[in-house]
Amino acid sequence: MLKKNKDELNDLEYLVTQENGTEPPFQNEYWNHFEKGIYVDKLSGKPLFTSEEKFESDCGWPSFSKALSDDEVVELVDKSFGMVRTEVRSEDSNSHLGHVFNDGPAETGGLRYCINSAAVQFIPYDKLEELGYGDLIPHFKDQGEK
């Protein structure tokens, strides 16, 4: 399982995960990334999202219709910047991940988890077993294809 200590985070990763920051839209690593695999918490290495739930939302950040497990994410009321939103944090490391909105695809439940790339690490499908995430392979529709 991949893990990082807080002192290993770069400036942007620290700003996002520890200071509730937001990275620029359309200028982040995973906003337009659709390779098969999982997205894990940058600090704890806990799996949070899969490419199966990722969709193109044109918001400039990676968007997912649901979390891999409700046990791994925490939703909190966020009243910053004069708005009321729902913040998403990692349960294990208490890192800020992004926000969840009710404007996602209706056919998948209507949610859009808008996640900062700086808060997650992508693990390609073909590396799941090697990196200790083999138990997640059944979450993929086409388990043999990359």
Swiss-Prot record:
Gene3D superfamilies: Peptide methionine sulfoxide reductase
PROSITE patterns linked to this entry: MSRB (PS51790)
One MF term in the entry's GO annotations: peptide-methionine (R)-S-oxide reductase activity
Chain ranges of the MsrB domain: 2-125
Catalytically driven reaction(s): L-methionyl-[protein] + [thioredoxin]-disulfide + H2O = L-methionyl-(R)-S-oxide-[protein] + [thioredoxin]-dithiol
Keyword Oxidoreductase set for record: yes
Active site: 114
UniProt keyword list: Oxidoreductase
Listed GO biological process terms: protein repair; response to oxidative stress
Record's signal peptide: none
Keyword Oxidoreductase: yes
GO CC annotations on file: cytoplasm
Family to which the UniProt record says this protein belongs: Belongs to the MsrB Met sulfoxide reductase family.
Name recorded for this polypeptide: Peptide methionine sulfoxide reductase MsrB
